[in-house]
Amino acid sequence: MLKKFLLNSLSAFVGAWVALMLFIFATVLFFIGLAASVASVESVSVSKHSILKLSLSGTIEEKERATEFDYNYLIQGGIEKPQTLNVIVKALQEAAINRNIDALYIECGGVSAAPATLNAIRSQVAEFKKSGKKVYAYGDGMTMGDYFVASVAYSLFVNPYGEVHLAGISGTTLFFKDLLDKVGIEFEVVKVGTYKSAVEPYIMNEMSAPARAQLDTLYTEMWDYILKDMASGRRMKASGINRLVNEFVMLKSGKDLVKYGLVDRSVYKREIDDIMARLVGRDRDKLHYVNPDALVGSTSWGAAYGSKRQIAVLYATGDIAETPSAGINCEKLVPVITSLAEDDKVKGLVLRVNSPGGSVFGSEQIGEALDYFQSKGKKLAVSMGDYAASGGYWISAGADRIFADPLTITGSIGIFGLVPNISGLTGKLGVHPQTVSTNPGVAFPSLFYPMNDAQRAALQANIEQGYDRFISRVAKGRHKSKEYIRSIAEGRVWSAPAAKRIGLVDELGSLSDAIKWVASESGVDDNYDVAVYPSYKPSVWDMVPAALQENAAVQELAARFESHSVDKALARWAAWMVSRPHAQAISLDVDIRL
């Protein structure tokens, strides 16, 4: 009895101590979040002769994360947020009309982003120039993404020993067929679409002719657009820049780059402040730079709860899933769309799509919810980002108008299924599975047996049914015949200009263009607020990655903590922290970045 009493007392003490520590930690997080939220809406005072400083470095995300708190920003790097496209664009728009902003300075530091994201920034910089304010850019060295954006500047500087990595567009795909054969793993494929090449790395040792042809066309069209814009910015001929690229200009130093006309001057970084000081008529030590986050302040798009007329912007970013995920979760997105449809304040919707696709079921649920939104007599436009392909196009197809960046990748109207079979591997390891079933579909699909003809035929029929649904949705949304859509589908990806020519896209334009169109069509013109969704305020439990919230080990630990009177949310969070060292994830992503 005494032993049991002592154990219970110790357990209660440990539980109370854990609860106290977690409460303190959660409180700290709360006040950090509160301070950050206050800072994000506080009006920023910009002194006269200020300079907007745009740092091109690292990755640029579509918008602030709205699905999951990223503890890495807090633990590893303070509360500094990653750069986001929506903030950069809004800051450039604000700087163009702010009388206290005299110029824009672009500091190139190795940006990594898809071409459409960079083009959106470059286009907005070009709009900023129309205000008559100067744009200067500098880099110790420049990636092609840096140079693509910076080439629109009035004056472009590079370090005397810096290089500009102009090399063109390339993509490499790894093929695993021989490796899989060696280890005894086979992937059985069912698909519809000649160009649906995502399965090829698992069943082939080289790229198919259709896959190579579509990528060659896509890359060439994108490179031609980028060349044309860079040449226009530098007042050169596109053919001249292309010739320099082919002559490995990326290995030339700053002085040579000046001679070729790719940059204006080669200077050291310490000289930039002197140049900017002369530009705005200030002493060097009195220069005032303001970053996009600080400038945007209370002017950023957000949920305008006090407004009677709103144009909603709903972000759909990442892979489409039907269960909780870090991408587009239909379980969370569909209720948001339904709520917007039934909200009288919301007069129209812009769906911002940046997705390479995903679940057929998830795509259809989102598509049906958007149909419901339109059934309320409200206008729907789609603004495409880097990608709106496969499932990303599925959810876009029914819009009243589709806008795409000139460097958007879209299309890929096709479906595939990939079924692994590890019977060869288990045989090599001396493992021999035996299955007893009442019906043929109980253990289907199985990792341990290849599909038989009946199973393969049933799965193929399922895939073709999904493909027909895809074709029908696109045909209805684009007001085309199913036969025509089939002729341009087949899983082929298209550049935005090509997609416009064949009727998959209506306009080449920005998110701002899409918002203005919806406002005009909804009859609200300039008298409206823009409200961004999904809005999100993370709880302590939301700080745990969604994939781990369902982990059995985490749940078991959480139950133990809860048994000692620890708050449920805190208990689950603590359990995840305990189990975190054992959690790993592997992802394979293929995309184009400049």
Identify the residue ranges that each predicted region occupies.
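Cleft-lining beta-strand/loop regions that shape enzyme active-site pockets
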Residues: 43, 50-173, 182, 302-425
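C-terminal long alpha-helix characteristic of the crotonase
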Residues: 232-233, 264-308, 416, 471-477, ...
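Active-site proximal loops enriched in glycine and acidic residues that flank catalytic Cys/His/Asp
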Residues: 315-318, 353-355, 384-386, 406-408, ...
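Charged, glycine-interspersed solvent-exposed loop segments at helix/strand-loop junctions
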Residues: 135, 173, 177-276, 423, ...
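Hydrophobic alpha-helical transmembrane signal-anchor segments
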Residues: 2-41, 49
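Short alpha-helical segments and helix-capping/turn motifs at coil-helix boundaries
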Residues: 35-40, 89-90, 297-298
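Short glycine/threonine-rich loop-to-helix capping motif typified by GTGT followed
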Residues: 360-365, 498-501, 543-546
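Intrinsic disorder and flexible/low-complexity segments
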Residues: 306-311, 315-345, 462, 534-594
